[in-house]
């Protein structure tokens, strides 16, 4: 079995696993919510095989995450159901725990880890995840590792912070060749040797009952759940199958026009993959691989003399160059920024020149000033902006070119830049399926 590269591993508790006194390996799945192209899951399988132990995949869904709503819950549960089906075909055991009251998950990881040799979880650099995984160190007494499966280049590889996309692109072009040939396994669970043997203490499953996806109605469950239902379920369906269907549709119909029309709201030339990326339901590696296969591209076509340029380095078509710049440069710059800058979502995180310019124009006369409520319900004089906000509120997405207009106009219509940023973050985090956390720090990937 191919080993997970050490550049993707962070050990939070460096304890030698004791296979004699423990029963299983745990993969605590919190960000990379998929069974394919997942380095974290692959690492868990690696440890389980090394120790001749079964694997438990623990995937919780807490109730009171920031801006929690039926929209996000439904999208995630659609994905969890498919994970449940995939794991059922393997030798692993899937333990989905969905809270019906806040804080119900508290204590479950601690109890399960008492008989675990190793606990593996996702190294996701933003939202509440870093704080949650760090806090868990106090509850876990065995070996505890974070594994990065965010993008093509490991997020902790660089020791330097990059602010400009051009500089980050040069850094990527210098390092990418090593990582585009080093990919996670397509189906890591197929490598698992040991069958699950009912080794979980039954008292644990009685206290924290796993959700039964096979015999439950997700919609009926959500109807009864005490959660914000004012943010409606999106017509965009979650899950790996829907992600793959959308990817295939994009390659067949939109990709050929991507470079020319991705910013045209009247065309459907963008990939629309962002929701699936954000919720970890599909991997950048898989999308990269599918585009490479479609193009018939190989690393021999790379032109090192064009390192740092937006076009030409890949030696591929115009569409491929453009798509990979969004998929890799801009998306991974977002992760990089969140790793290097803890205040990435605060006004103070902006570059000095930006803060200076915004400050100089903070007192400029504004023809229109709107409240957060007026913006929320599209009550402005601008029909195009209203349409973009309607799409965000009703569907959870905004066409990528209109999203830039959306943000610029909020800045123009707010009392000052600080208020504008707070409005953008509130609207974005409450409604958006695809722009949460990392991509806000840089730009949207696709």
What are these regions (language model features)?
Residues 35, 43-55, 63-118, 123-131:
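N-terminal Rossmann-like or analogous alpha/beta NTP/dinucleotide-binding catalytic cores
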Residues 343-345, 351-363, 403-431:
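Active/binding-pocket-proximal capping segment
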Residues 437-446:
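Single conserved hydrophobic/aromatic residue that forms the stacking wall/gate
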Residues 1-25, 30:
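N-terminal regions that are enriched for targeting/export leaders
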Residues 21, 154, 161-339, 343-348:
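Glycine/tryptophan-enriched, flexible segments
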Residues 365-366, 370, 374-410, 414-417:
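C-terminal structural cap/anchor segments
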Residues 105-198:
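Internal, well-ordered domain-core segments that constitute the primary functional module
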Residues 322-388:
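Aromatic-anchored, charged helix-turn/loop surface patch used as a conserved interaction hotspot
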């Amino acid at each position: 079995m191919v080993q997970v590269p050490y550049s993707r591993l962070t050990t939070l508790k460096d304890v030698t696993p004791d296979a004699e006194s423990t029963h299983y390996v745990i993969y605590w799945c919190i960000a990379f919510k998929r069974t394919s192209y997942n380095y974290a899951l692959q690492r868990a399988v690696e440890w389980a095989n090394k120790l001749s132990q079964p694997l438990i995949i623990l995937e919780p869904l807490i109730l009171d995450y920031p801006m929690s709503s039926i929209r996000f819950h439904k999208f995630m549960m659609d994905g969890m159901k498919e994970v449940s089906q995939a794991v059922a075909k393997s030798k692993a055991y899937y333990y989905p725990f969905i809270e019906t009251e806040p804080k119900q998950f508290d204590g479950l990881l601690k109890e399960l880890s008492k008989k675990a040799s190793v606990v593996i979880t996702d190294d996701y650099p933003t939202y509440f995840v870093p704080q949650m995984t760090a806090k868990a160190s106090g509850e876990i007494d065995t070996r505890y590792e974070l594994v990065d499966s965010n993008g093509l280049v490991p997020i902790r590889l660089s020791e330097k912070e990059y602010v400009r996309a051009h500089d980050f692109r040069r850094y990527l072009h210098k390092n990418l060749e090593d990582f585009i040939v080093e990919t996670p396994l397509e189906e890591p669970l197929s490598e698992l040797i040991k069958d699950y043997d009912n080794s979980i203490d039954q008292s644990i499953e009685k206290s924290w009952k796993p959700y039964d996806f096979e015999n439950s109605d997700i919609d009926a469950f959500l109807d009864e759940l005490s959660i914000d239902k004012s943010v409606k379920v999106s017509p965009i369906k979650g899950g790996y199958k829907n992600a793959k269907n959308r990817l295939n549709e994009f390659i067949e119909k939109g990709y050929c026009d991507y470079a020319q029309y991705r910013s045209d709201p009247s065309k459907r030339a963008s990939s629309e993959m962002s929701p699936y990326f954000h919720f970890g339901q599909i991997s950048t590696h898989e999308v990269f691989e599918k585009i490479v296969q479609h193009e018939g591209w190989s690393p021999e076509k790379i032109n090192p003399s064009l390192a740092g340029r937006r076009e030409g380095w890949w030696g591929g078509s115009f569409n491929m160059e453009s798509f990979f710049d969004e998929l890799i440069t801009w998306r991974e710059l977002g992760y990089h920024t969140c790793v290097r800058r803890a205040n990435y979502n605060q006004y103070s995180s902006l570059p000095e020149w930006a803060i200076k310019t915004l400050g100089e124009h903070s007192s400029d006369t504004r023809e229109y000033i709107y409240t957060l409520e007026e913006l929320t319900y599209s009550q402005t004089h601008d029909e195009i902006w209203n349409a973009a906000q309607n799409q965000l509120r009703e569907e959870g997405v905004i066409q990528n070119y209109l999203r830039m207009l959306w943000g610029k106009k909020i800045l123009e219509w707010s009392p000052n830049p600080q208020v504008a940023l707070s409005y953008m973050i509130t609207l974005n985090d409450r409604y958006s399926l695809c722009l949460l956390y990392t991509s806000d720090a840089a730009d949207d990937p696709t």
